[in-house]
Each structure stands twice: as C-alpha cells, then as structure tokens.
A protein has these predicted regions:
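Alpha-helical segment proximal to the catalytic Tyr-Lys
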Residues: 48, 91-95
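Active-site loop immediately N-terminal to the catalytic Tyr-X3-Lys motif
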Residues: 20-21, 67-73, 95, 138
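Active-site helix of classical SDR
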Residues: 43, 78, 86
C-alpha cells in the first residue's frame, strides 16, 4: 500500500505453432485472452495510477507482425492487435501525460520458445545459430537487450505511440548473398 506505479509492462504471451487449418477456437480464445485481453484489462486498471506519475504503458509485441512465419497466425494476429492498441491508447492517454509504446522483439533467447514447441531443448543452440546469420548484427538477441529497450521507452518523456523493432537487423534482409 502507498507505493506508486511508474510503468506497466504487458509481457504475457501464449505461443504455439499450428498450420492455419490446425488450430481450434479454443486456441484462438486462449491466445487472445492471454496476449490481448489481459493487457487491455491491466492497462485499464493501471491508468489512474500512471496518471499520478505521468508514467508509461509498454506492450510487448513481436516482429511476427512484420514478417510472415508459417504456423504463427494466432500469435501474429494478437501481437498486431497490441500494435494497434498502442496507437489508440497513446492518442487517448497522451493528454493525461501517459506515454504508450510497443516493443517488437525479433529472435530472442527465451523460455517461451521452448514452451511454444518451436524446437526441443537439444535443438536450441543449433536453431539459434541457424537464424543468427539472418541478422545484420550476426546473432540473436537476449532478454536483457529487450529489457534495455523497454527501459528506454519508459524513460523517454517525448516518445509515445511507437512500435520499436528490437531485432538485431533481421528486418534488413540477409546480411550476405
């Protein structure tokens, strides 16, 4: 009791791989409840507290919204919803001095990748090595690097409504021919 809230980081995620004709309504509902509805509800509850501190709301999206990854339809759709929500909330909450941003991580070493069944624990090193060359910086990212970008948005008093790609340059295309 009595504490203050400077920032809310909406980082809940549910991800699994299924072809378009393989997911169920239950999969879709679970993805939307975890990735979108929880973020909207938490943000709504946080607004009065963030207004007192002129704080920030940060959503964790994904570069899945910028590039097509087969099997990721529900995940990409929910993360795109967070990008749209970022713009709307930034416009709505700006006059109340609350900034809203979205971070779009690329390939990052996280527990979610294992839980999503993207690859087994035995395959993790070889899979990350395989995609490292697709990045302009020649490697995948770390959770700490994503956290640094979150801190940047939280601390920047003149940035709102943006979706920042934190992807080591994978969006630039292959780094060699």
């Amino acid at each position: 009791h009595g504490g203050k809230l400077d920032a809310l980081v909406n980082n809940a995620a549910n991800m699994y791989r299924q072809p378009v004709d393989g997911y169920t309504e239950e999969h879709l509902r679970e993805a939307f409840e975890t990735n979108v509805i929880s973020a909207m509800m938490l943000s709504s509850v946080a607004v009065p507290h963030l207004e007192k501190t002129e704080g920030s709301i940060i959503f964790i999206g994904s570069t899945h919204t910028r590039r097509a990854f087969p099997g990721a339809s529900p995940y990409a759709t929910t993360k795109a919803a967070l990008e749209g929500l970022t713009k709307v909330m930034a416009a709505e909450l700006g006059p109340r001095k609350i900034r809203v941003g979205c971070i779009l991580p690329g390939a990052v070493i996280t527990e979610l990748n294992l839980r999503a069944g993207l690859f087994s624990e035995d395959e993790i090193e070889s899979r990350y090595s395989a995609v490292a060359g697709l990045h302009a910086l020649g490697r995948v990212g770390t959770a700490e690097e994503v956290a640094e970008s979150i801190a940047h948005l939280v601390q920047s008093e003149w940035i709102t409504g943006v979706a920042l790609e934190v992807d080591g340059g994978i969006g630039l295309g292959a780094s060699s021919f």
